[in-house]
């Protein structure tokens, strides 16, 4: 699978706007904001949701549909409001893409204003069904209207609301399939009985042809970002008689804990007794787990998810998010952004560690996965190239098996890599010009010195320009970069070896 967004059937979009198809998808618009000013009062995601693309100049954005440009954003600005003000007849703001797809799909016999979409991925035919380019809820949210999705639309299959019910659908799951039924069911998916094809009980989206490095939750979110289950919204399924029956049979399908007696931290920590295993029992208890008394097996009191065979370096919260991302306790404690980031990181790690031959489609997938990482986007804003970031991330994952956990460490390694590269280039140049060893050493030492005091080593990267020129003490006294005179919005401390 690649990170390319879905494109609707061309019959759903008039010929005169075919060139706009690429940016009908919100994430394709968001990708243009890689170098958008990080200090903007209005976030890149908000602007992309309102139909804007980044122009690359200041904070100026432009609508992909009407091409109206807006800049000089202020705190409290409404992206949709300003868009509507400058271009009240914009097709995007007025729901043209949503309404057009609904009209076409109705004509083709598909209910609820939804049409078939496919993702062409070279040799891959991983696909999705029943997803419009913009969901009705997203349109109402964007235009400021009240979101009112009737229970007859969501979820698509109330009988599969509970994870247990979805898990039972995998009785004939093929042996060749790469993902486990438990992981798929946890991501809201149930087996359709055809090949390795699964379907979301909520949005109705279908996925198949799974690859070894795929993660169910990541792919669900990537292909169906507006799914209410993915977004963690309340589905209000209790109004459905089928759902009530399902709730009685499967208590875990509600927001209530699977094991209420273990809802308190003290109760969970008590179960660990004389815990002798490598993972800290306090961390396990805080992450919602209690001990089962069988080796290092633990179970979450809320979702009922179990884990075992712990490694010393594993973090309980991360493992909880990796294997049971739909857990309500996890969502309440850590938030959806944390869960998403964990899946982005693990998806990249497993692709790089397990795959020996990188096909063009897999390379694109890895690139897109790296690009989604918030740390990567911040490093790009600081002036580092995507090529250098990708290279150093791949090296770290191949060596250690894990990705970077903090921006500070990533930036430090990038700076050190640049320094090593500069040393190599300097060494080659010195040999060509027959410069003495003493001269080479002097130059390298000067490169590390603060360009203001020429006494202490450089230790601060200026954002957004990315220049590395001063020590910590001298950096405190400047508001503009001494190299390019750009106003400094943030000063990132780094460590040089």
Swiss-Prot record:
Tissue: Expressed in colonic crypts (at protein level). Ubiquitous, except peripheral blood leukocytes.
Post-translational modification: S-Nitrosylation down-regulates its E3 ubiquitin-protein ligase activity. Autoubiquitinated. Ubiquitinated by TRIM32; leading to proteasomal degradation.
UniProt effect for mutating residue 214 to S: Reduced interaction with HTRA2. Reduced interaction with HTRA2
Effect of residue 343 to A: No effect on interaction with SEPTIN4 isoform ARTS
Per UniProt, location of the Glycyl lysine isopeptide (Lys-Gly) (interchain with G-Cter in ubiquitin) cross-link in this chain: 322, 328
Assigned GO CC terms: cytoplasm; cytosol; nucleoplasm; nucleus
Function recorded in the entry: Multi-functional protein which regulates not only caspases and apoptosis, but also modulates inflammatory signaling and immunity, copper homeostasis, mitogenic kinase signaling, cell proliferation, as well as cell invasion and metastasis. Acts as a direct caspase inhibitor. Directly bind to the active site pocket of CASP3 and CASP7 and obstructs substrate entry. Inactivates CASP9 by keeping it in a monomeric, inactive state.
Involvement in disorder: Lymphoproliferative syndrome, X-linked, 2: A rare immunodeficiency characterized by extreme susceptibility to infection with Epstein-Barr virus (EBV). Symptoms include severe or fatal mononucleosis, acquired hypogammaglobulinemia, pancytopenia and malignant lymphoma.
Protein name in UniProt: E3 ubiquitin-protein ligase XIAP
């Amino acid at each position: 699978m690649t990170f390319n967004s879905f494109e609707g059937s061309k019959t759903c979009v008039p010929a005169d706007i075919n060139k706009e198809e690429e940016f009908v998808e919100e994430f394709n618009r968001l990708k243009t904001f890689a170098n958008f000013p990080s200090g903007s009062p209005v976030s890149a995601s908000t602007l992309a949701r309102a139909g804007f693309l980044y122009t690359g100049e200041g904070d100026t954005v432009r609508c992909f549909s009407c091409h109206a440009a807006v800049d000089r954003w202020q705190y409290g600005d409404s992206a949709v409001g300003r868009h509507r003000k400058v271009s009240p007849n914009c097709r995007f703001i007025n729901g043209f893409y949503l309404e057009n797809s609904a009209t076409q799909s109705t004509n083709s016999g598909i209910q609820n204003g939804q049409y078939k979409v496919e993702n062409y991925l070279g040799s891959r035919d991983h696909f999705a069904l029943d997803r419009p380019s913009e969901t009705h809820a997203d349109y109402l949210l964007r235009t400021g209207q009240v979101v009112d999705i009737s229970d007859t639309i969501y979820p698509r299959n109330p009988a599969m609301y509970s994870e247990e019910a979805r898990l039972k659908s995998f009785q004939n799951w093929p042996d060749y399939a790469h993902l486990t039924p438990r992981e798929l069911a946890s991501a809201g998916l149930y087996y359709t009985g055809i090949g390795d094809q699964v379907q979301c009980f909520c949005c109705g989206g279908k996925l198949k042809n799974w690859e070894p490095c795929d993660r169910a939750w990541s792919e669900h979110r990537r292909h169906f970002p507006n799914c209410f289950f993915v977004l963690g919204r309340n589905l209000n399924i209790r109004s459905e008689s089928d759902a009530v029956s399902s709730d009685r049979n499967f208590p875990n399908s509600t927001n209530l804990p699977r094991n209420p007696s273990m809802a308190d931290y003290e109760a969970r920590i008590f179960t660990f007794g004389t815990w002798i295993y490598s993972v800290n029992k306090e961390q396990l208890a805080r992450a919602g787990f209690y001990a089962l008394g069988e080796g290092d097996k633990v179970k979450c009191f809320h979702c009922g998810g179990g884990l075992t065979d712990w490694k010393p370096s594993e973090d309980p919260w991360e493992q909880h998010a990796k294997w049971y991302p739909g857990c309500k306790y996890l969502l309440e404690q850590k938030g959806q952004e944390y869960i998403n980031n964990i899946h982005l990181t693990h998806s990249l790690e497993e692709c790089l560690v397990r795959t020996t031959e990188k096909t063009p489609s897999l390379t694109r997938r890895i690139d897109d996965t790296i690009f989604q990482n918030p740390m990567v986007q911040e490093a790009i804003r600081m002036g580092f190239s995507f090529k250098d970031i990708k290279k150093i991330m791949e090296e770290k994952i191949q060596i250690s098996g894990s990705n970077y956990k903090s921006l500070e460490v990533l930036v430090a390694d990038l700076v050190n890599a640049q320094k090593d590269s500069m040393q190599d280039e300097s060494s080659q140049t010195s040999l060509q010009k027959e410069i003495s060893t003493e001269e080479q050493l002097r130059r390298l030492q000067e490169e590390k010195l603060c360009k203001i005091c020429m006494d202490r080593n450089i230790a601060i990267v200026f954002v957004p320009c990315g220049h590395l020129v001063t020590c910590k003490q001298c950096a405190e006294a400047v508001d503009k970069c001494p190299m390019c005179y750009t106003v400094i919005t943030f000063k990132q401390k780094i460590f040089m070896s």
